[in-house]
UniProtKB/Swiss-Prot annotation:
Assembly information from the UniProt record: Monomer.
Catalytic residues of the enzyme: 412 (nucleophile), 465 (proton donor)
The protein's role, per its UniProt record: Catalyzes the formation of the alpha-1,6-glucosidic linkages in glycogen by scission of a 1,4-alpha-linked oligosaccharide from growing alpha-1,4-glucan chains and the subsequent attachment of the oligosaccharide to the alpha-1,6 position.
Main enzyme class: transferase
InterPro entries per record: A-amylase/branching_C, Branching_enzy, GlgB, GlgB_N, GlgB_N_E_set_prok, Glyco_hydro_13_cat_dom, Glyco_hydro_13_N, Glyco_hydro_b
Cellular component annotations (GO), alphabetically ordered: cytosol
Metabolic or biological pathway: Glycan biosynthesis; glycogen biosynthesis
Similarity remark: Belongs to the glycosyl hydrolase 13 family. GlgB subfamily.
Keywords: Carbohydrate metabolism, Glycogen biosynthesis, Glycogen metabolism, Glycosyltransferase, Transferase
Protein name: 1,4-alpha-glucan branching enzyme GlgB
PANTHER family named among the record's database cross-references: 1,4-ALPHA-GLUCAN-BRANCHING ENZYME
Reactions that this protein is recorded to catalyse: Transfers a segment of a (1->4)-alpha-D-glucan chain to a primary hydroxy group in a similar glucan chain
Pfam families for this protein: Alpha-amylase, Alpha-amylase_C, CBM_48, GlgB_N
Length: 731
């Protein structure tokens, strides 16, 4: 064992020595590592807690570095030529053993200057590859390159398992003017936990998780993890080649919305592995085309369902490793399912280890709470006017779409981004530069985001959760729109659910709640969403919204689903809705799968499968979703009977949906049809296979030359109560 070395005065002044040992020195490369001293090379090493330090040359020559103070070592190293990082290694004796490593302060700058300039100018293209923790080999030495954007920080160090979380040991180099701090640490590899210790502009020292970490600890732990960067072995080439066609506005899109943590409890099995084995096949068997996941990004509070994320580049560790998530996506693609992620660029939580005041200033957020704090969620709002923040968010979006082969992003809370006065009373918001309420910077960001996705991720889609009548959400950016592919139709959802909650005897007075959606159905490219938001916070389940006894509730839910699947717009249904979950969704418990022991609930599930099949295989139900010529009212004004009938058409086919929203049968109900001939029943929600009582119309009906509702031909049938029928014209 080496003996403690005698101390020396050293060549550093006392103030510099004190700053290094106190963790306050802002430019460690100016004093640590190899430095020319006349004709000789001096090596200085800061290793608090070390007993001895040796500099070892490639030929084996060993030079002891002598302590100026405990933990700060220096000596002239004979034969050492400066400028060659591999010219020596360090042999450090700690209380627990010997460490052999290259000297981090022997390496020059490791980040590409041109790429840094690009990022500093607001470019996102290189951001995910520059910042964060990345495996690197520098001058033949393997390790990890760390980088953090913190332009106003006085000092930044990387701390972790590899240095005992001692912020003095690995202070970073500032790359001015980009405001990025960097350090290459030899011998640090995948799995190492780390954080950044930041001495902020406000004089406070804080520990921050890596904003661009690609792996993170599971809460309540908050450290980032150096990722394993071995590429995943994807098998989805065929899917990726055809996904653009599967996601166009003329394609059938039926989305199964899932919270990964509560879909199924597989006795403690890793979540993504368990889901990969079950969920894709289940969704495929029911005819869904996509799975949409509530946010999977790392988030500190499970009760937020992921909508308050802090790790915009890392899958939540509670569900498994990043490779497990990639495997899940790959399995979905193997099953013919697209994967959409909910993504949250609207706000972020103010947890101490997160983005809030990251460098001692409001860096990612606004300084003024009238712009920077969200009144609904008590979270912080991104400063979209800052080019580096926009680049950070766009880099996150592209990361999920490219690195994980995700097929789309559903952008959360877009309305809160578009309006400066969103949920704010008078006097509590700041107008834009023109004196208006529109958030011009957020508008520019959304347009830039959608343009980037379109160029960088061909075939991927973006979907806006936008709850107002903002014009042009799905219009092209070139035409002044925001550039989304689809928008959630929140108005349709609110109107129709409000209607369904009413006692059927009163529905005649609210007929417009069902029909009004067609007034604006083609203003945007819409998704009809029955999402998680409708089964939480005391709203009850979808089944529970239906009035009456259990049999009536199930009949009305079947009717409502058939109305929705026939209505123009892509479909979205939250998990549990497919079999009539009775209780409100609880993110801490799995779905009520035991309900499928009941034939009535199995029948509802079977109806969803049949609706998806009919929707996907009959082109008139999807190919003109964005074209007004694909829809025509037949009976839109029969409020007294609470009956609706409408046609869905394409160039060669016609399907008529007839819906009775009361329990009262309508015998001899006549309605016009566009074509003479036979009309076959494709769906009858009252059929026994769906849990109904049966007794519906015959499988085939022939039109009569009796004019009705503006058509020379008509059908007449006995229309059961709480029933929807799909009738397709036979060529």
């Amino acid at each position: 064992m080496m003996r403690d070395s005698p101390s020396i005065q050293g060549t550093l002044d006392a103030a510099t020595q004190h700053a290094l040992l106190a963790g306050r020195h802002a430019d460690p490369f100016s004093v640590l590592g190899p430095h020319q001293a006349g004709a000789h090379t001096v090596v200085r090493v800061l290793a608090p807690g070390a007993r001895t330090v040796m500099a070892v040359l490639p030929g084996g020559q060993r030079t002891p570095l002598l302590p100026m103070q405990p933990g700060l070592f220096e000596n002239t190293v004979p034969g050492l030529q400066p400028g060659a990082p591999a010219a020596y290694r360090l042999c450090i004796e700690w209380e627990g053993g010997i460490q052999h490593t290259a000297d981090p302060y022997a390496f020059g700058p490791v980040l590409d200057a041109a790429q840094l300039d690009h990022c500093a100018a607001g470019g996102w293209r290189y951001l995910a590859g520059l910042l964060g923790a990345h495996a690197a080999s520098v001058d033949g030495c393997a390790g990890t390159r760390f980088a953090l954007w913190a332009p106003n920080a006085r000092r930044v160090a990387v701390v972790g398992d590899f240095n005992g979380w001692d912020g003095r040991r690995h202070a970073m180099r500032l790359r001015y003017p980009a405001g990025v701090w960097e350090l290459f640490l030899p011998d640090v590899g995948p799995g190492a936990r780390y954080k950044f210790q930041v001495l902020g502009a406000d004089g406070h020292t804080v520990l921050k998780a890596d904003p661009l970490a690609r792996q993170a600890e599971a809460p309540p732990a908050t450290a980032s993890i150096v990722p394993d960067e071995r590429p995943f072995a994807w098998t989805d080439e065929a899917w990726m080649e055809q996904r653009a066609a599967r996601q166009r506005c003329d394609a059938p899109i039926s989305i199964y919305e899932v919270h990964a943590g509560s879909w199924f409890d597989d006795a403690g099995a890793p979540r993504w592995q368990s889901l990969a084995a079950r969920l894709p096949e289940y969704a495929r068997s029911l005819g869904f085309t996509h799975i949409e996941l509530l946010p999977v990004m790392a988030h500190p509070f499970g009760g937020s369902w992921g909508y308050q994320p802090l790790g915009l580049f890392a899958p939540a560790a509670a569900h498994g490793a990043p490779a497990d998530f990639a495997h899940f996506v790959d399995r979905c693609h193997e099953a013919g399912l697209g994967v959409i992620l909910d993504w949250v660029p609207a706000h972020f939580p103010d947890d101490a280890h997160g983005l809030a005041r990251l460098d001692g200033t409001p860096l990612y957020e606004h300084a003024d709470p009238r712009e920077g704090r969200h009144p609904d969620w008590n979270t912080l709002i991104y400063n979209y006017g800052r080019r580096e923040v926009r680049a950070f968010l766009i880099a996150s979006a592209i990361h999920w779409l490219r690195h994980y082969h995700v097929d789309g992003l559903r952008v959360d809370a877009v309305a809160s981004m578009l309006y400066r006065d969103y949920s704010r009373p008078a006097g509590q918001w700041i107008p834009n530069r023109h004196g208006g309420r529109e958030n011009l910077e957020a508008i520019d960001f959304l347009r830039e985001l959608n343009a980037a996705v379109g160029v960088q991720c061909p075939g991927a889609i973006t979907v806006a959760e936008e709850s107002t009548a903002w014009p042009g959400v799905t219009a092209p950016v070139a035409n002044g729109g925001l550039g989304f592919d689809y928008k959630w139709n929140m108005g349709w959802m609110h109107d129709t659910l409000r209607y369904m909650r009413r006692d059927p005897i009163h529905r005649r007075h609210h007929h417009h709640d069902l029909s009004f959606g067609m007034v604006y159905a083609y203003a945007e490219r819409f998704v009809l969403p029955l999402s998680h938001d409708e089964v939480v916070h005391g709203k009850g389940s979808l089944l529970g919204k239906m009035p009456g006894e259990r049999a009536a509730q199930l009949a009305q839910l079947r009717l409502y689903y058939a109305f929705m699947w026939a209505h123009p717009g892509k479909k979205l249904l939250f998990m549990g809705g497919e079999f009539g979950q009775q209780g409100e969704w609880n993110h801490d418990a799995m779905l009520q799968w035991s309900l499928l022991d009941d034939p009535a609930h199995r029948g509802l599930q079977r109806l969803i499968a049949d609706l998806n099949h009919v929707y996907a295989t009959l082109p008139e139900l999807h190919c003109r979703d964005a074209d007004p010529s694909g829809f025509a009212w037949i009976v839109g004004d029969d409020a007294d009977n609470s009956v609706l009938a409408f046609a869905r058409v394409d160039a060669s086919h016609c399907l008529v949906a007839v819906c009775n929203f009361t329990p009262v049968p309508r015998p001899g109900y006549r309605f016009g049809v566009p074509h003479a001939g036979d009309w076959r029943v494709r769906v009858d929600t009252g059929a026994t296979r769906y849990g109904g009582a049966g007794g519906g119309p015959p499988i085939c009906l022939r039109s009569e030359p009796i004019p009705a509702h503006g058509h020379p031909q008509s059908l007449v049938l006995d229309l059961p109560g709480f029933t929807a029928l799909y009738l397709r014209h036979s060529e």
